[in-house]
Amino acid sequence: MQVPVQITFDNVEHSDAVEVRINEEVVKLEQFYDRLISVRAVVERPQRRHHKGDTYMVRIVLTVPGGPDIVVNRDPGLNHAHEDIFVAIRDAFAAARRQLQDHVR
């Protein structure tokens, strides 16, 4: 992996497993588009409480040459799947990949 990756945990305990998963997702993005300049990811748990459990929100900022940053905010809304941090990460990076594909076209 050559792209610098900044990972921030907000209201979430640091997890090596989460960092590994994010870095794996970044490698997949690099395989598609090798000109990424940097990636910033914020994993957070909003302070509001839900009846069934806490959900996670993942924000990703991809810095690309010659264009505005690609920003993805995956707010869980009513999606209870985002009670699993790894599902929230997967969904956020899937959205980032789609936006990156649009940028390349």
Locate each region found by the language model.
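N-terminal, polar/charged subdomain of small-to-medium soluble alpha/beta proteins
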Residues: 1-105
